[in-house]
């Protein structure tokens, strides 16, 4: 029979729509503005007393508190107004001190039964939630030049060790230049370098009677250095962003040499730039002898709080400036280890310090500039007030203490670690002492929370007006079939929101534009179908046959048009940046949902209403 679906197909469509309604429902529950409290270190746990103290301080400061709670992640205080978030953060930070991290957050109000089903609202982009956007550019040329200088030092150290006489020449065209007065020295140097430095292309040349050895990095090694630099800077930036106490920050790579940092809720760009640009370092020191004088030792805490403090010698062997690489791996027995590489000068210093101290322990001290807030009295508008002044304090902690098994050089390894997790963390900390390459701020943008809320309101208005005008147009043109298309359009919006929520896609202002565009594209499919039905009726077909042929013959055109649009969406996503990607994601998901609602859902409703009935005329 024409225009009839089997029962299973109706049930399948109902099931898909039900899932759509369930997973789009969390977006009906707006998040509460909140401040989140956690310990600055894993050893410090937030207690209910801390939360109560913070809540009381907020109430005393005239900031309305909606509710508070305590979980394994820390304390959460919900506020009534979003504009109170920044003042609340300052009050709580001042009340609890620098031992606690106070972060701006948005607390979900989704009912428990929806959360158990995995339902959560869409994430909002920076243009809708407010915050700071930075685009950092990594100077890759400086990264290559710095690594080349390290290799130059190592090559010269090798030649001096093997007593090969050479003349030092300046680096030229990304290549180390070495001059020799005789071919015998050149050949010996070439053989030594080729043996110990496999990542170099060694080419002999002759210039003005001087024999020159040109030592250049291979293209593969250059690519490896650039990749390492961007990854290392990405890791360091992530570590520094964590100190800002921001809920759900975004730190991701963009292109070959750029890093995007988005900090929702942050309005103080100066503080964010200070944190991102701050420095950390490392020190390698020998553990103090039991009979050492107190004046010659210094005691340090471990980064791991369960271990007791250890006295170390005041003399520093090398610093993190000499560490060129650190990576986690496994030894020949499958045990975790950390491989460390030093520059030429660092290797000499390390060898000098360890060759007579085999059997003693050596510690790696991590030095970090921690942000603290101090309060000073200042005159503000003729009134003396306490004003927060951001500052940094130096914190030194031991991250590794290992026994020296043999004299060390510019390459050595740390073993005796508890597991691969500890080796990975140690390697990360050894690399986090600084940036692998200089960075500068290529772009900076601040979006206030009120502007974000205004963008949301305007986006909702645009979507509603768009849906209203599209619905009126299609109802006027196609009458009762226009009503069916409008219902399908509403289902399409529900399905699109549900799909974005399930996938965890971020909704941005261009994404809202994609939603409005999706409405027109969804109705476009209905227009093709209904126009085809009109044509078949005009050609003298019966009502049932016209409906059947209208849907079937329009399908190919709809599929071709939507596949072409999906291809464009894919290209936009692959080639575009943040805002363009947001638009591409929403548009592409909207195309998928519109094909389902315009073809399957609309057909199901038409079949239920008109299928199997003897209609002489259609309201189309």
From Swiss-Prot:
Part of the Sec protein translocase complex. Interacts with the SecYEG preprotein conducting channel. SecDF uses the proton motive force (PMF) to complete protein translocation after the ATP-dependent function of SecA. GO terms for biological process: intracellular protein transmembrane transport; protein targeting; protein transport; protein transport by the Sec complex. It is a multi-pass membrane protein. Forms a complex with SecF. Part of the essential Sec protein translocation apparatus which comprises SecA, SecYEG and auxiliary proteins SecDF-YajC and YidC. The keyword Cell inner membrane applies. This is Protein translocase subunit SecD. It holds the Pfam family SecD-TM1. It comes from the Bacteria. Belongs to the SecD/SecF family. SecD subfamily. HAMAP family: SecD_B. GO terms for molecular function: protein-transporting ATPase activity. The keyword Transit peptide does not apply. The gene is secD.
């Amino acid at each position: 029979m024409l225009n009839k679906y089997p029962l299973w197909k109706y049930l399948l469509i109902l099931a898909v729509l039900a899932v759509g309604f369930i997973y789009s429902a969390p977006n009906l529950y707006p998040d509460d503005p909140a401040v989140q409290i956690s310990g600055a270190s894993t050893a410090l746990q937030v207690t209910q007393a801390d939360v109560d103290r913070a809540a009381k301080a907020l109430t005393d400061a005239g900031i309305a508190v909606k509710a508070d709670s305590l979980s394994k992640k820390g304390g959460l205080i919900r506020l009534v107004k979003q504009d109170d978030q920044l003042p609340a953060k300052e009050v709580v930070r001042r009340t609890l001190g620098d031992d606690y991290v106070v972060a701006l957050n948005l607390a979900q109000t989704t009912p428990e039964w929806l959360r158990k089903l995995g339902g959560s609202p869409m994430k909002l982009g920076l243009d809708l939630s407010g915050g700071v956007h930075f685009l950092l550019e990594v100077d890759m040329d400086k990264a290559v030049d710095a690594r080349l200088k390290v290799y130059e030092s190592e090559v010269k150290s090798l030649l001096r060790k093997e007593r090969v006489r050479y003349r030092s020449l300046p680096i030229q065209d990304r290549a180390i230049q070495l001059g020799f007065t005789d071919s015998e020295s050149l050949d010996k140097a070439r053989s030594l370098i080729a043996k110990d430095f496999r990542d170099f292309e060694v080419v002999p040349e002759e210039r003005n009677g001087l024999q020159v050895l040109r030592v250049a990095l291979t293209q593969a090694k250059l690519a490896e250095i650039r990749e390492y630099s961007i990854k290392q800077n990405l890791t360091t930036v992530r570590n520094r962003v964590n100190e800002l106490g921001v809920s759900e920050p975004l730190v991701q790579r963009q292109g070959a040499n750029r890093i995007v940092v988005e900090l929702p809720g942050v309005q103080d760009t100066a503080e964010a730039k200070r944190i991102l640009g701050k420095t950390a370092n490392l020190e390698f020191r020998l553990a103090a002898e039991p009979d050492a004088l107190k004046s010659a030792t210094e005691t340090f805490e471990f980064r791991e709080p369960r271990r007791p403090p250890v006295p170390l010698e005041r003399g520093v062997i090398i610093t993190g400036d000499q560490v060129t690489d650190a990576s986690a791996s496994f030894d020949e027995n499958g045990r975790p280890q950390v491989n460390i590489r030093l520059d030429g000068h660092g290797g000499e210093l390390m060898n000098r310090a360890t060759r007579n101290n085999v059997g003693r322990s050596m510690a790696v001290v991590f030095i970090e500039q921690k942000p603290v807030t101090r309060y000073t009295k200042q005159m503000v508008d003729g009134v003396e007030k306490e004003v927060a002044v951001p500052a940094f304090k130096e914190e030194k902690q031991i991250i590794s203490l290992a026994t020296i098994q043999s004299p060390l050089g510019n390459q050595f390894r740390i073993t005796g670690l508890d597991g691969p997790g500890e080796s990975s963390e140690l390697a990360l900390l050894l690399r986090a002492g600084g940036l692998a390459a200089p960075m500068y701020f290529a772009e900076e943008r601040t979006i206030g929370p009120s502007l974000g809320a205004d963008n949301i309101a305007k986006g909702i208005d645009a979507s509603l007006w768009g849906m209203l005008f599209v619905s009126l147009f299609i109802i006027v043109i196609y009458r009762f079939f226009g009503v069916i298309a409008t219902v399908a359009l509403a289902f399409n919006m529900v399905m699109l929101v549900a799909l974005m929520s399930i996938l965890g896609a971020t909704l941005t202002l261009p994404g809202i534009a994609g939603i409005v565009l999706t409405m027109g594209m969804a109705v476009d499919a209905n227009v093709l179908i209904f126009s085809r039905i009109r044509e078949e009726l005009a050609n003298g077909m019966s009502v049932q046959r016209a409906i059947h042929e209208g849907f079937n013959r329009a399908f190919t055109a709809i599929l071709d048009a939507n596949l072409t649009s999906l291809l464009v969406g894919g290209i936009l996503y692959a080639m575009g940046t943040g805002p363009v990607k947001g638009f591409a994601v929403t548009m592409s998901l909207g195309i998928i949902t519109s094909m389902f609602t315009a073809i399957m859902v609309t057909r199901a409703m038409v079949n239920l209403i008109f299928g199997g009935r003897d209609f002489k005329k259609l309201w189309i």
